[in-house]
Amino acid sequence: MLRGNPLGDPWRRPLWVYVPPGYDAEPDRRYPAVYILHGYLGHLEIWRNRAPFRKTLIEAADQLFADRAAPPAIVVYVDAWTSYGGSQYLDSPGTGRYHSYLCEEIVPWVDRHYRTLAHRDHRGIAGKSSGGYGAMITPMLRPDLFGGLASHAGDALFEYTCVAKFLGCIRFLRAYGGDIQRWWKEFQERGVLAKPADRSLLILYGVSACFSARTDGTPEIPFDPESGMLIPDVWRRWLDVDPVRMVSGHAEAMRSMRGIWIDSGAADEHHLDLGAQAVDQALARAGVRDETKRFELFPGGHGDLDQRHLLSLAWLAQRLAPSR
């Protein structure tokens, strides 16, 4: 699905598949599967990065299942890095077919090569930040494939969480005459995040490639770089893929989920706690039952999400396990 992508990024990708303790000892047993999505500027290797006094998610998941603290599950770690730093797990002429890659290539491959319970009721998806965004929208678009989700500070409520970031980008772009293409050319020549503007402008440019690329693949930013005014036609494309707004159009899909976990740090630096609240409220308006969803604002910020994955993994494994 990624062959011939517009950025020339590798179309062959690593894929990590974790199998729980006892997998080889019970050759006739099949397992639910949970797909894990990394955030923007993230990549597959982050899942085995070691932090002080903390296990990696892979180690923690292994301990979770070894201790029988949750029903055993297969855990699939997906790579969706691009030269812009991420894909938002969407199909776009600016980045490539990452939604299709996940749904049409990875899921069938895993089902063919591992003993999964190959049904949407036993398949979940989870992620943090932009990975949390992907975990929210993918089951909306493909409820035939995914029956549960967990989003940790996923991107949502764009008029607050995105527009707040645009203000700094407008100032940064003054040094480039308001021309983000000029910045991009310079950044490519440097090839490293070295200037204060780089991270913000890379995310703006990359997410524009995901949400509002022109047909030729050129990212189109959603505001006038001089006045700062939003460009209505472009901004509408962003709002169309805001999970808060998507819920109403995919209400039946959301009501069909076996479990929906939405959380964020209450002090999230990107105000994604507001996005999480708005998604939870949209789910309630769509008729998702309280017993189906779990919502929490926990003490902490955007850098405190890794510990949340283990909690939602245990919860999803329970929700997606077959009835005994």
Identify the function of each model-found stretch.
Residues 1-324:
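Non-catalytic cap/lid and distal C-terminal segments of serine-dependent acyl enzymes
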